């Protein structure tokens, strides 16, 4: 583990140092959603394992430059091509290797993994009602399910953090994975509470089994990319 010191900052921080994990001892976790893929643009909905688009490759390059400034120690990623390609750009910028982790995969949503529009109309209406009223992965027929997804997301992140205490760790995953884990950290019942943008960074600190959300859906590194081409519309 590298030795780091933090600037003293606001004196009020002394009151929240332990509660909010302020200081250099906590593990820094950077949850990154993969950059724009051909699945996101509709170019490849069939394979389930789409490559990045040209825009996505530029987003990934910018992620690498941004995270290099954080002096990251390790880069983990789900095994799918869109996450591996994003993670490779981040790792290359910092002279690191990508560590694949199967349990970082996307939440399995059954028919919705392909095209929920293929469901009968009554079934689609039922799914829509459950999404609004309950907001959990249980709304999707044939899905992995909320409890299973939450346990998987929680356990794999705990495993990664426990293996590298005090380090700065990048985890490249998927939108539903990030939504689920943030919901767990915040102690919420709903599984999806925000939309993680492509190539966004959600920062979490961890220590002694506790997790504190520090920053959510950060895309400052995408400034200047036009809406529809990697920027936010």
Regions found by a protein language model. Name each.
Residues 214-233:
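Acidic, His/Gly-rich catalytic cores of divalent-metal-dependent hydrolytic chemistry
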Residues 2-19, 23-24, 62-129, 211:
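Phosphate-coordination/substrate-recognition cap region in phosphate-metabolizing enzymes
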Residues 126-148:
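Short glycine/proline- and acidic residue-enriched helix-loop micro-motifs
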Residues 29, 167-175:
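Generic beta-sheet signal
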Residues 29-31, 36-90, 142-154:
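Loop-to-helix element that buttresses phosphate recognition and phosphoryl-transfer chemistry
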Residues 44-52, 115-117, 189-190, 230:
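Short glycine-enriched, charge-decorated loop/helix-capping segments at active-site entrances
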Residues 69-71, 160-167:
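Glycine-rich phosphate-binding loop signature in dinucleotide/nucleotide-binding domains
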Residues 188-212:
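Domain-level recognition of soluble alpha/beta enzyme cores
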């Amino acid at each position: 583990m590298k030795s780091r010191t933090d600037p003293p900052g606001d004196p009020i921080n002394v009151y929240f140092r332990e509660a909010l994990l302020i200081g250099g001892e906590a593990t820094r976790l950077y949850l990154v959603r993969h950059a724009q893929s051909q699945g996101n643009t509709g170019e490849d909905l069939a394979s389930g394992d789409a490559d990045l688009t040209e825009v996505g490759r530029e987003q990934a390059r910018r992620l690498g430059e941004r995270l290099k400034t954080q002096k990251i120690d390790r880069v983990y990623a789900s095994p799918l091509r869109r996450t591996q390609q994003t993670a490779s750009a981040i790792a290359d910028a910092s002279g690191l290797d990508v560590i694949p982790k199967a349990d970082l995969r996307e939440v399995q949503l059954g028919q919705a993994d392909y095209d929920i529009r293929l469901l009968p109309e009554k079934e689609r209406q039922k799914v829509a009602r459950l999404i609004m009223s309950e907001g959990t992965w249980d709304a999707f027929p044939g899905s992995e399910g909320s409890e299973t997804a939450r346990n998987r997301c929680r356990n794999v992140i705990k495993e990664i953090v426990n293996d590298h205490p005090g380090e700065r760790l990048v985890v490249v995953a998927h939108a539903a994975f990030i939504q689920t884990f943030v919901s767990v950290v915040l102690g919420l019942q709903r599984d999806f509470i925000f939309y993680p943008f492509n190539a966004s960074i959600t920062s979490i600190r961890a220590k002694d089994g506790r997790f504190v959300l520090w920053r959510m859906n950060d895309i400052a590194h995408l400034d200047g990319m036009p809406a529809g081409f990697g920027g936010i519309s």
